[in-house]
C-alpha cells in the first residue's frame, strides 16, 4: 500500500498551526505500521532548507509555470517538493504577505499543489506511484478534483483539520487551473458562486475524515459546518465520513525525556513535577507557592478558543487563590485584557505575549491545570499534551476535547476514568463551575494525584491513529 500525503506544512520544517504537527508525526507512525508513505509539500524556503538532499525527479510546464519535482528525505520519511520559486520563494508566512494580505496568486499556488498530487498518481515519478492520495485541508483540496477529472487513477482521502478555512476564489479562476467548467456547480466545487477548494476536497474525495469522532458528527450540523452541512450529512449517510483522532508525538511531548523541562518525571515520579512548577512561577513573575493550583493557557488569543471566557472568569479564579500563566498572541483586545490583569494582580497572573515552542513545554510541565475552553475544537492537541504531562485539562465539551477528556465527576472518579474537568455551555458561569470543581479536587491531594496518573496512562499515540488510517485505506482499495 503506497500513500501520498498532500499538504502545505510539516513540523518542524514549517508550522503555522496544528496541521504541521500532524504531518510531522503521522507519516513516520504509518511507516512503522507497514505502509509505504511519502509527503508532497510546496517548496517554501524553510522546507527547502530542511531537506538539503532533495534532487530533481521530474520537470513539467504547468498552468502555473515551469516546475521541478524534487525528492529527498526528512527523519526517515520520503518528501516530494514542488520547486517553483516564482510561486513559493517568499519570506514569512506561506499564505500571506507581511501586511497579512493573502497572496493574490494563492489560487495558482495551491491549485498546483493539488494538481501535482494527482499527477503523482499518473506517474509523475516513474519509480513510485501512490494507491491513495491523502489530501489535508483546503490547500490540498483540489487533489481529489483533479483525480476525478483524470478518471480516478488512485483513491483519495480528504482530511478536515478545520472547516472554518475554506479556500474561496473567484469563479473566473476556473479558466486558470485546468479543471473542466462542468465541475463548477453545486454538485462540484462551486459554493456561493465562488470556487471553493475545501468543497472540492469534500465533494470529490472517496472518503472524508475529520480529526476527531465528535467533530465528524458536529460538522454535519449547521452551527459547525459553515454551509457544508448538506454535503457532509450526505457523505455521513453514505458511510464516507468518519473521525480519526489525532495523536501526540511522544518523541517531542514526553515528560520522561523532555530536555526542555527543569525536572523530568513519569506517572510514578510525579513529585518531580514540583520543580517545574517552581521554575515556571519564577519565570512568569508569580509568587512561588506549591500550595495553590497554577492554571495555564497556551493558545491563540481568539474568541473561538474561548479566551474571552477565561478573561471574564479570571476574577473568580483569583479569588479562590489560584494563579494563571498565559502564553499566546492574537486578538489585541484580549491581549490588552490579560496584560491589564497581570498588572493588576502581580504575583498571581503572568502573561507572555507571543508563542515560543520551548516555553510551551515548560508551561505544560509546570502547570497544574491547562485551560482549553474552545467554542469549537476539531481535535485539539493542547489537552492531549496536558494529559501526557499530568497537567489536568479543563475543557469545553466539543470536538476532540469531548473525545479525550473525562470530567472528574463522582461517577468517573469511582470508575477510574476521570482525567480532567469538562463544562458544557460556552459562558463564563459554566467555566467557573468547572474551575470550582478543580479547586475541590485540588483540596484532596491524593485524589488529584490519582487523576493525574489516570490521565498520564491514556494512550493517544500516533500508532493508534496510524492503524485506523491503514484500515481505512484498505477498505477503499
Curated annotation (Swiss-Prot):
Signal peptide: none annotated. Belongs to the glycosyltransferase 1 family. Bacterial/plant glycogen synthase subfamily. GO terms for molecular function: alpha-1,4-glucan glucosyltransferase (ADP-glucose donor) activity; alpha-1,4-glucan glucosyltransferase (UDP-glucose donor) activity. This is Glycogen synthase. GO terms for biological process: glycogen biosynthetic process. GO terms for cellular component: cytosol. Keywords: Glycogen biosynthesis, Glycosyltransferase, Transferase. It is an enzyme of class 2 (transferase). The lineage of its organism: Bacteria, Pseudomonadati, Pseudomonadota, Gammaproteobacteria, Enterobacterales. It comes from Salmonella typhimurium (strain LT2 / SGSC1412 / ATCC 700720). It catalyses: [(1->4)-alpha-D-glucosyl](n) + ADP-alpha-D-glucose = [(1->4)-alpha-D-glucosyl](n+1) + ADP + H(+). The keyword Lipid biosynthesis does not apply. ADP-alpha-D-glucose binds at residue 15.
Amino acid at each position: 500500500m503506497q500513500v501520498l500525503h498532500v499538504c502545505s506544512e510539516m513540523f518542524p520544517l514549517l508550522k503555522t498551526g496544528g496541521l504541521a504537527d500532524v504531518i510531522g508525526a503521522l507519516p513516520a507512525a504509518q511507516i512503522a505500521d507497514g505502509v509505504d508513505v511519502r509527503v508532497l509539500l510546496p517548496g517554501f524556503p524553510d522546507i527547502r532548507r530542511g531537506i538539503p538532499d532533495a534532487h530533481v525527479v521530474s520537470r513539467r510546464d504547468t498552468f502555473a509555470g515551469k516546475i521541478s519535482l524534487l525528492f529527498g528525505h526528512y527523519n526517515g520519511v520520503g518528501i516530494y517538493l514542488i520547486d517553483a520559486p516564482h510561486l513559493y520563494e517568499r519570506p514569512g508566512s506561506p499564505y500571506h504577505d507581511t501586511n497579512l494580505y493573502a497572496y493574490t496568486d494563492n489560487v495558482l499556488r495551491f491549485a498546483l499543489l493539488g494538481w501535482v498530487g494527482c499527477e503523482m498518481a499518473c506517474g509523475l515519478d516513474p519509480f513510485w506511484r501512490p494507491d491513495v492520495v491523502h489530501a489535508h485541508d483546503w490547500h490540498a483540496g483540489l487533489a481529489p478534483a483533479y483525480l476525478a477529472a483524470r478518471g480516478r487513477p488512485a483513491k483519495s482521502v480528504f482530511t478536515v483539520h478545520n472547516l472554518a478555512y475554506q479556500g474561496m476564489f473567484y469563479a473566473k479562476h476556473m479558466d486558470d487551473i485546468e479543471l473542466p467548467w462542468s465541475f463548477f456547480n453545486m454538485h462540484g466545487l462551486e459554493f456561493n458562486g465562488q470556487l471553493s477548494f475545501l468543497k472540492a476536497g469534500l465533494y470529490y474525495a472517496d472518503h472524508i475524515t475529520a480529526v476527531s469522532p465528535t467533530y465528524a458528527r458536529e460538522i454535519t450540523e449547521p452551527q459547525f459546518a459553515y454551509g457544508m452541512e448538506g454535503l457532509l450529512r450526505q457523505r455521513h449517510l453514505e458511510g464516507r465520513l468518519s473521525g480519526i483522532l489525532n495523536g501526540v508525538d511522544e518523541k517531542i511531548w514526553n515528560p520522561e525525556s523532555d530536555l526542555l523541562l527543569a525536572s523530568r518525571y513519569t506517572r510514578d515520579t510525579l513529585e518531580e513535577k514540583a520543580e517545574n512548577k517552581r521554575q515556571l512561577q519564577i519565570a512568569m513573575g508569580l509568587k512561588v507557592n506549591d500550595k495553590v493550583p497554577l492554571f495555564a493557557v497556551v493558545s491563540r488569543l481568539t474568541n473561538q478558543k474561548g479566551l474571552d471566557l477565561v478573561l471574564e472568569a479570571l476574577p473568580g479564579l483569583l479569588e479562590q487563590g489560584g494563579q494563571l500563566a498565559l502564553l499566546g498572541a492574537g486578538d489585541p483586545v484580549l491581549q490588552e485584557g490579560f496584560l491589564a490583569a497581570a498588572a493588576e494582580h502581580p504575583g498571581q497572573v503572568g502573561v507572555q505575549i507571543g508563542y515560543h515552542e520551548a516555553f510551551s513545554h515548560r508551561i505544560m510541565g509546570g502547570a497544574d491545570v491547562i485551560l482549553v475552553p474552545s467554542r469549537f475544537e476539531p481535535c485539539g492537541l493542547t489537552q492531549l499534551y496536558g494529559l501526557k504531562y499530568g497537567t489536568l485539562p479543563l475543557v469545553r465539551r466539543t470536538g476532540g476535547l469531548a473525545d479525550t477528556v473525562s470530567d472528574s465527576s463522582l461517577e468517573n472518579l469511582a470508575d477510574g476514568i476521570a482525567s480532567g474537568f469538562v463544562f458544557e455551555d460556552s459562558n463564563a458561569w459554566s467555566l467557573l463551575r468547572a474551575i470550582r470543581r478543580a479547586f475541590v479536587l485540588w483540596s484532596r491531594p491524593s485524589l488529584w494525584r490519582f487523576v493525574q496518573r489516570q490521565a498520564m496512562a491514556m494512550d493517544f499515540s500516533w500508532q493508534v491513529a496510524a492503524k485506523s488510517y491503514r484500515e481505512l485505506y484498505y477498505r477503499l482499495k
